[in-house]
């Protein structure tokens, strides 16, 4: 019987030879593997300082992905907005940053300061004690020069506040960076107005985890050596006299030198017209007149505050920054480190707080409907104060418009492109202006509020240049358009009606207010100096120009018509008023002292000529 095997002998031999070849190849490759070199003794970690963790041979540690920090504003944008106030004294700077988070309150305070130019210092703070503003805004009305500067650019105020709410540590870093630039150019130095103090921040030891190389036993050794961070320089600014505050005013393009990022030029707040700023043209740096105050400055900046856990208090529901968060160790700040002087704070607000270690916290109730920069910031600060703490309110679900706007913001941050102004943005801006108009309190007419805002120095210079470069025909055309403009005519008629319907007491009060206004007094003094220093030829040319003006001719014609249409009784009353006021003017020392002999003789001649003409009539 013939037996058939399932495998042929030669096939079995071939399979066995292939197995032997594979085994020999594996042994050869293993014998050629290079072992990892042993570290020198000086770099090995001590077993007593290391923690041993054993892993299976087939398991490898996953790679560590660094956390991505989301920034709402770039460094160039923050430098652009911080530049006008980085050289302010620390206390004043901190309160400007706090107040900028309430743009509507600032707008109302600017208008109040404009309507009350004689109020400053502690008296101004007492006058606004009943206003529904944050304490930081109330404190700034003590400095009318500062309010005039902040009123020049409301959009800058809101941008600065949004940056401070979103990235307080970046704002403080920008302050130090810009102060170092100003110190390098020689613009920032101690003076009679303020002290510049440069200190070296203590080196902070930081523990860093180091992972040792993998050894054949599959054991990972970790240690925590102490590494010292390099020391940093901190520049702080304080008033030379704590009871007198000077408002700095400077041109950022001069004091900081060449600006690094020309795509984001620094914001410049020129000194407003009529505000006394003593400027130094050498350094491009000047100060306002000193303002005496005892409690207007109630905050300070702790530049050395590295321990974020010591700001934990029992009444943290009001005076801590919303940018922080709570954990098991206490309150964590985002780097703002603004501390509050409770005594001065209580004098401004009328409260009776007793905690001596308080830090500032943004209060959304004083935002007055002004939207926050983005949805994340709105979630953080869309809260309402209630008894027992803070209660967050539910925000509406994101819509397509909000998602589209968020995508556009992310694209702008990545590419640094100019923002795209969409219809939704325009609607939001219009709604914001409407909300601001509703919250102006006694200044509820937003159009009148914007029209009453003082012109900036740049606008005045541009208007002056246009007027000087215009031809006589162009000036005449502008005058005619103004005379025929129905709106201007309505304003004239309304003013004329108010004057005619005013009582003698009201007219006298207006005259006294105009006479005691320091700006009007300065203008009168400047005009008087120009007249006294003018030559006879210049005066004659000016008289001819005045006589040739059609408006003056029209005024003379109108006056002549009123005189001709007046009744004898009205003329008699007018003559009596003139005769009563003439001796008072001639005997007034303020007028006679300024006149020389020639001017007095000229006045007497004109009076005699007028008397002769009246006798002829």
Curated annotation (Swiss-Prot):
Biased composition regions of type Polar residues, renumbered to the chain: 387-396, 453-474, 549-570, 586-599
Cross-referenced Pfam families: DUF3300
InterPro entries assigned: DUF3300 (IPR021728)
Region called Disordered, residue ranges: 387-419, 443-599
Biased composition (Basic and acidic residues): 490-499, 522-531, 572-585
Biased composition (Low complexity): 404-414
Disulfide bonds: none
PANTHER family assigned to the protein according to its UniProt record, in alphabetical order: OUTER MEMBRANE PROTEIN (PTHR40269:SF1), OUTER MEMBRANE PROTEIN-RELATED (PTHR40269)
Name listed for the protein in its UniProt record: Uncharacterized protein YacH
Species, as recorded: Escherichia coli (strain K12)
